[in-house]
C-alpha cells in the first residue's frame, strides 16, 4: 500500500470514528446526563430532578424530555413534556438561538414558608445580593418560537398573618421572535 492510500485510510477511519463517537454521545450520552448526572449536580442545591425519559437527536439538535419534575423543599416545577430545538451554528454569529421551546402541561408552584423562605431560594446565592455586575454580554439570545400548552401556576404564602393562596390553570401562551440582538440604532429587538 502506498503512502497516499495509507494516509487516506487513516483519515477516513478517524473521520468515521469521530462521527460514531459524536452520534453515540448525542443519542445516548446527553439523555443519560440529563437523567442521571444533572440530578446529582442539583443535590448540591438540596433539589431533586426526575426525568422519566429524555431523547436527543445530534443531527437535528432536538431534545425531548417527558415527565420532568424539579423539587426543593416542596414541588417547584413539573411538566408532561419539554421540546427544544436548537440552532447551534448561530453561535458563530455570537447568538444562542433556540428555534422551538415548548412546554406541555407545565406546573409552576411558588411557595413561601412560615420562615419567609421561598421554595426556589436554594438556587439563589447570597453572594450575588451585594455585588453588581454592569457588564454586557457579547453573546445575544434569540427565541424564535415558545409555547406553553395547558400550563398552571400557583403561589402560596404561609408567612402572612392569614395564609394566601392563588392559582391559575389552563394557561396557553405563545411567543415568537424574542431577540436580544441589537439593531443598527443600538436598541434591543423584542
Regions found by a protein language model. Name each.
Residues 1-46:
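N-terminal type II signal-anchor transmembrane helix
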Residues 45-48, 129-135:
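Short acidic/polar N-terminal linker immediately downstream of export determinants
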Residues 49-53:
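A short linear hydrophobic-aromatic micro-motif
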Residues 55-117, 131-159, 174-186:
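Flexible beta-edge/linker motif
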Residues 120-128:
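Surface-exposed loop/turn segments flanking beta-strands in extracellular/periplasmic regions
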Residues 169-173:
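Short, flexible N-terminal segments of the mature chain
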Residues 189-190:
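Conserved small/polar residues in nucleotide/adenosyl-binding loops
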Amino acid at each position: 500500500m502506498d503512502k497516499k492510500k495509507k494516509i487516506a485510510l487513516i483519515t477516513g477511519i478517524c473521520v468515521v470514528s469521530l462521527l460514531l463517537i459524536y452520534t453515540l454521545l448525542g443519542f445516548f450520552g446527553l439523555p443519560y446526563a440529563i437523567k442521571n448526572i444533572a440530578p446529582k449536580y442539583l443535590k448540591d442545591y438540596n433539589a431533586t430532578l426526575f426525568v422519566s425519559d429524555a431523547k436527543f437527536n445530534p443531527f437535528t439538535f432536538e431534545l425531548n424530555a417527558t415527565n420532568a419534575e424539579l423539587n426543593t423543599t416542596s414541588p417547584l416545577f413539573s411538566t408532561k413534556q419539554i421540546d427544544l430545538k436548537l440552532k447551534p451554528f448561530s453561535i458563530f454569529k455570537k447568538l444562542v438561538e433556540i428555534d422551538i421551546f415548548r412546554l406541555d402541561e407545565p406546573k409552576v408552584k411558588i411557595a413561601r414558608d412560615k420562615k419567609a423562605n421561598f421554595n426556589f431560594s436554594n438556587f439563589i446565592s447570597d453572594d450575588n445580593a451585594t455585588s453588581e455586575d454592569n457588564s454586557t454580554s457579547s453573546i445575544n439570545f434569540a427565541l424564535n418560537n415558545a409555547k406553553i400548552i395547558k400550563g398552571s401556576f400557583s403561589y402560596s404564602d404561609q408567612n402572612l398573618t392569614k395564609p394566601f393562596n392563588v392559582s391559575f390553570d389552563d394557561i396557553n401562551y405563545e411567543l415568537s421572535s424574542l431577540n436580544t440582538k441589537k439593531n443598527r440604532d443600538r436598541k434591543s429587538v423584542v
